[in-house]
């Protein structure tokens, strides 16, 4: 990968990405007795229509691509992504990876195979396709919690690194606003170039030194939870502005981590989640950043140039 990118509707070149939101979820369903991760018939069509509404909303702001890092254990549905892409004209990049790392990796280890089996699964989904859909993943998702990286999380990182080195696929991470530097080191020591890594949910931390350590290590920092009610957007924007003022625009990407259809979960755009919608960065956050001195050139760097360079495999400027 690098010369081309797998998407839900085929392959494209990095130059075709355009404006990109780096972390949004079209559909999420946690596993369990009520899970219905593969909706069909009228339900599939209704869900696709709702999700397409959000997709059309971001299209009005010039967004061309969405990275959807939903994993199989969060209800990943490649066919739904392809349908939403067809209805909206969006390019949607889906992921391979695991979210519920502790339980999954523990079971894998007990059944035999461990890191080898998981890396083989990732490679298969990146090169052959997901299940029988023939839709290939375009990025690898990994997860760590806090306060330390546990053994199962380390094994997931190593499996992802092995798949990344074998295929050239980039990696996007989940953090709780900590351990991004540790993720960077484990992946890097396993052979993944740091500029092929996005450290996700970095906006959960207000620590400029933490962010600076990541960007100085040549990975990208994602401010990708704008609109979530756990922290005011003004706080996230202030932290992002510090990094822009320090000259790090070329290391930053933005998004919302929004869920367009969450089965048995909250509905975005209402109540406490009224701002947790994929248009929020354009409608509310850009004006905040402009007031702080951010420029249109910096917005395009974060939204267009950095995703293009990241997927192309280029080194940050």
Regions found by a protein language model. Name each.
Residues 23, 66, 98, 164, ...:
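Divalent metal-coordination and catalytic microenvironments
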Residues 81, 150-155, 178-191, 207-215:
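Distinct, well-ordered alpha-helical segments
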Residues 89-90, 167-168, 188-196, 213-222, ...:
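Glycine-enriched alpha-helix->loop->beta-strand junction motifs that scaffold or abut catalytic
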Residues 174, 224-225, 248-272:
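Short acidic/histidine-rich active-site segments
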Residues 18-91, 116-135:
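Alpha-helical scaffold segments that flank or form the walls of functional sites
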Residues 83-86, 91-166, 220, 225-230:
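Active-site gating/metal-coordination segments in enzymes
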Residues 2-10, 278-317:
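Mid-to-C-terminal alpha-helical segments outside catalytic/metal-binding sites
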Residues 72, 200-205, 224-243:
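Active-site glycine- and acidic-residue-rich loops that bind
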């Amino acid at each position: 990968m690098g010369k081309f990118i797998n998407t839900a509707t085929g392959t494209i070149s990095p130059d075709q990405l355009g404006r990109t939101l780096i972390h949004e979820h079209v559909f999420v369903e946690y596993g369990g007795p009520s899970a219905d991760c593969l909706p069909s018939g009228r339900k599939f069509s209704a869900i696709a229509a709702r999700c397409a509404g959000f997709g059309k909303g971001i299209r009005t702001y010039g967004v061309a691509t969405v990275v959807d890092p939903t994993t199989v254990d969060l209800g990943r549905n490649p066919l739904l992504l392809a349908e939403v892409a067809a209805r909206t004209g969006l390019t949607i990049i889906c992921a391979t990876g695991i979210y519920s790392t502790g339980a999954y990796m523990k079971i894998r280890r007990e059944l035999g195979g461990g890191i080898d089996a998981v890396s083989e699964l990732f490679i298969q989904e990146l090169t052959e396709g997901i299940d029988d859909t023939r839709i290939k993943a375009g990025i690898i998702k990994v997860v760590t919690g806090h306060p330390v990286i546990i053994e199962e999380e380390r094994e997931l990182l190593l499996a992802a690194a092995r798949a990344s080195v074998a295929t050239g696929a980039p990696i996007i991470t989940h953090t709780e606003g900590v351990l991004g530097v540790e993720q960077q080191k484990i992946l890097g020591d396993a052979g993944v170039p740091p500029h092929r890594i996005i450290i996700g949910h970095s906006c959960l931390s207000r620590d400029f030194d933490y962010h600076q350590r990541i960007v100085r290590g040549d990975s990208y920092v994602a401010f990708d939870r704008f609109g979530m009610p756990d922290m005011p957007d003004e706080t996230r924007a202030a932290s992002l502005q510090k990094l822009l003022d320090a000259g790090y625009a070329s290391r930053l990407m933005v998004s919302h981590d929004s869920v367009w259809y969450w089965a048995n979960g909250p509905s975005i755009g209402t109540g406490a989640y009224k701002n947790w919608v994929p248009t929020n960065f354009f409608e509310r956050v850009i004006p905040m950043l402009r007031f702080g001195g951010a420029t249109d050139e910096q917005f395009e760097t974060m939204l267009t140039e950095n995703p293009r360079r990241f997927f192309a495999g280029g080194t940050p400027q």
